[in-house]
Design a protein with these regions (language model features):
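Beta-lactam-recognizing serine transpeptidase/beta-lactamase-like catalytic domain environment
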Residues: 1-82, 87-325
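Ligand-recognition elements built from short beta-strands and adjacent flexible loops
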Residues: 279, 323-338, 345-389
Length: 389
């Protein structure tokens, strides 16, 4: 091995992965991760009633490595949608052009050049602050914020957050073909659409590293899968460590973003309430965007991507969870706060205790909790209700 000239194949090294327990977790609760039985051609099997069959005994040793031999988190592009509003918020606050109480008015429709933009459901939010705009995911607010920030400043921050280059993760085949507008290409419409995440095609991991920088004090960090390498005696041969690429925003701006994201989840009362897990301070943001290929559904609307990003503890984040549902098959709603947020909450409920993430410090011992009657409730909805207790 040219890159490891001292490597002895007769004395193999071991590694400590940051996500080394996923196989155990998936096998324990396959329904949480949507693991279903498939035939030899990869088609999901169904029972006599047409329902998919959970695979509770499968071998998942390679599940996260070689599904189609493609890691979509770094090889495929998508429109981030409203999750990107976290970054636009950071741009406005850090540049001094906005603060948490800055107001704009949303009348439900907003014209830019020859285009007319709307919020979800054509809802008019009225005059609202930045904190409320993030919580209510107001497109029109963010268009106006983007206009105030301006094309050059917008692009400068966009680049600083690492979205114009590869993340540098230690995994193969990370794409470098992101699609975005440079400063001199950000016309009125391009800037308006970019401000709420519907004009740039990036990888999910790029969105994760950008959000991480927004909440960790402002530092863009290179992500790694391997934490350290040890020999057969347990001695650390190589420790990867933390590689800080640069500081993007100030500590004070990052503190504001953390507060706003926690307000979004709101202890089970905010716009991201379905990601809340009792005992933890969680920050989050939902996002619903159109698929990159712009394919249409049977109802004529574009196919969607529902996503949710969560960080915890919100006051001093240690982990980030990012859930993406590509063209979720749900006839009732496209809202990621309903579709993706509960998945994030379920993951947090399993991962946080395993990793020893600190709770909010409130002593709940001896507390009597009334469990709601969930008979007949869909599994995902029942899980959300139990997470809140």
């Amino acid at each position: 091995m040219a890159s490891k000239p001292d490597f002895d194949p007769n004395d193999p090294l071991d590694y400590s992965a940051n996500l080394d327990y996923l196989n155990e977790l998936v096998r324990a609760e396959p329904e949480l991760y949507g693991i279903y039985k498939k035939d030899e051609n990869g088609n999901e099997l169904k029972d006599a009633n047409g329902n998919r069959i959970l695979d509770e005994e499968g071998d998942y040793s390679g599940y996260f490595r070689d599904i189609q031999w493609k890691n979509k988190a770094i090889t495929e592009l998508y429109y981030p949608g409203s999750v990107f509003k976290v970054i636009t918020s950071a741009m406005g606050v850090d540049s001094g052009l906005a603060n948490i109480n800055t107001t704009f008015t949303c009348a439900g429709a907003y014209g830019v050049a020859k285009e007319t933009y709307h919020c979800a459901g054509h809802k008019a939010h009225g005059t609202i602050t930045l904190a409320e705009a993030l919580r209510q995911s107001c497109n029109i607010y963010y268009i106006q914020l983007g206009q105030r920030v301006g094309s050059q400043t917008f692009y400068n921050y966009f680049d600083a957050f690492g979205i114009t280059s590869r993340t540098g993760v230690d995994l193969p085949s990370e794409t470098g073909f992101m699609q975005y507008y440079k400063a001199n290409q950000l016309g009125e419409v391009q800037l308006a659409s970019s401000a709420f995440g519907q004009a740039m095609a990036i990888t999910p991991l790029q969105m994760c590293t950008a959000v991480a920088a927004a909440v960790n004090g402002g530092y863009l960090v290179t992500p790694h899968v391997v934490d350290k390498i040890t020999d057969t005696n347990g001695n650390v041969v190589e420790e990867i460590g933390t590689n800080i690429r640069r500081q993007v925003i100030s500590e004070s701006t990052s503190d504001v973003i953390r507060q706003m994201m926690e307000y979004e989840v709101g202890n089970g009362t905010g716009g991201g309430k379905n990601a809340y897990v009792s005992g933890y301070r969680i920050g989050g943001k939902s996002g619903t965007s159109e698929q990159l290929n712009m394919h249409r559904r049977a109802d004529g609307d574009y196919k969607k991507v529902a996503s949710f990003v969560a960080v915890l503890p919100a006051n001093d984040p240690e982990i980030l969870v990012y859930v993406m549902l590509d063209d979720p098959n749900n006839a009732r709603t496209d809202y990621s706060s309903i579709l993706a947020a509960p998945v994030a909450g379920n993951i947090i409920s399993e991962v946080a205790p395993y990793l020893g993430i600190a709770t909010d410090g409130e002593d709940r011992s001896g507390t009597i909790v009334t469990v709601p009657n969930l008979v007949g409730t869909e599994w995902s909805n029942a899980q959300v209700q139990l997470n809140i207790q």
